[in-house]
Structures are given as structure tokens and as C-alpha cells.
């Protein structure tokens, strides 16, 4: 996918694109941060290599990472779930159990979302956080020499998925990151 190319097209098309390009947007008038990530079956995860529970945990956690990078405290999420019509009730129950556990651990409330049909499972989380510092951080403020902090290793989830789907040996830690 040509993400940067698409972002440039979007920026040039929208009347106001000042928030486009960062993982997290700070809305000054509301004093909140907003982020959204989508996980799609067979691209970001495989149902052959993960459980619905772990998928639920991961779907929330990737958003919490974006909020943490912006120095904000997560407060609310919405969950949009797309899935095939033959999806079992137990899948939804376990997925939301994983979502709920991460929310409970971080004092986050699920405030809504959407459910729709699709060929494959896709889960999209919108997370809202409150500013916890007088400082704002974002890519647009970054400059040469800045210190960058991350909440995990870059590419470990993709590497774990690749190892699992290609039947390659990988350390258990890497497999769990998927």
C-alpha cells in the first residue's frame, strides 16, 4: 500500500487537513486526543494463529500506544466490528472479553461503535484520551535530535504473523506479539 502517497492525496483534497498524518489528533477546543486503528483479517492478524480474546486485547492496545505517544490518558473507545454472517456468538463474546479486560486495566469505557457484515473480520477502534501534560507531542513537532520513545518493538507483530503463516521458527515472544 502507498500510505504516504494516499495521505498526500487526502491532504490536497480536504479543505482542512491540518490533522492528517499523525497517529493521534489533539482537538484544542475540546482538550482531547483522538486516534483510530483498524485491524483486518489476513493482513494484520490470522484467525488461525490468534484467538478472539487476544485479538480484542490487541485491537485496543494499538490505540493505547498512539495515545501514550501523545502523552494523553485514555478514557473512551468506540468499537466498529465487521464480520462474516456465519460468525459464531462465541467469537464476539471472546473478542469483547479481551476488549473489556484491557479497558478495565486502563479505566476506559466503551461508549459505542458499529457492527456490520463483511467477507473477513475487521475491527476498528477509535480511542479518545485526555491531555495529561502541558506539553503536546506529535510528528509535526518533531525535529532532528529529539528523543523518541516507543511502547514496543517496531515490526514485531508483523514478524510474528509472518512466522506463523509461513511456518517459520520464531521465538515465543515474537509469536505472542502477533
Name these PLM-found stretches:
Residues 1-178:
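Helix-biased detector of long, well-ordered alpha-helical tracts
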Amino acid at each position: 500500500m502507498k500510505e504516504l502517497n494516499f495521505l498526500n492525496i487526502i491532504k490536497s483534497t480536504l479543505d482542512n487537513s491540518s490533522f492528517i498524518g499523525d497517529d493521534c489528533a489533539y482537538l484544542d477546543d475540546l482538550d482531547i486526543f483522538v486516534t483510530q486503528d483498524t485491524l483486518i483479517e489476513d493482513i494484520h492478524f490470522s484467525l488461525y494463529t490468534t484467538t478472539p480474546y487476544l485479538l480484542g486485547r490487541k485491537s485496543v492496545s494499538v490505540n493505547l500506544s498512539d495515545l501514550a505517544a501523545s502523552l494523553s490518558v485514555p478514557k473512551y473507545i468506540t468499537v466498529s466490528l465487521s464480520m462474516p454472517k456465519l460468525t459464531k456468538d462465541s467469537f464476539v463474546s471472546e473478542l469483547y472479553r479481551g476488549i473489556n479486560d484491557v479497558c478495565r486495566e486502563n479505566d476506559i469505557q466503551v461508549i459505542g461503535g458499529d457492527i456490520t457484515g463483511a467477507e473477513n473480520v475487521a475491527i476498528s477502534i477509535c480511542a479518545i484520551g485526555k491531555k495529561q501534560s502541558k506539553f503536546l507531542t506529535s510528528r509535526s513537532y518533531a525535529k532532528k535530535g529529539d528523543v523518541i520513545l516507543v511502547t514496543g518493538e517496531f515490526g514485531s507483530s508483523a514478524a510474528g504473523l509472518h512466522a506463523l503463516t509461513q511456518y517459520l521458527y520464531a521465538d515465543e515472544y515474537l509469536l505472542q506479539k502477533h
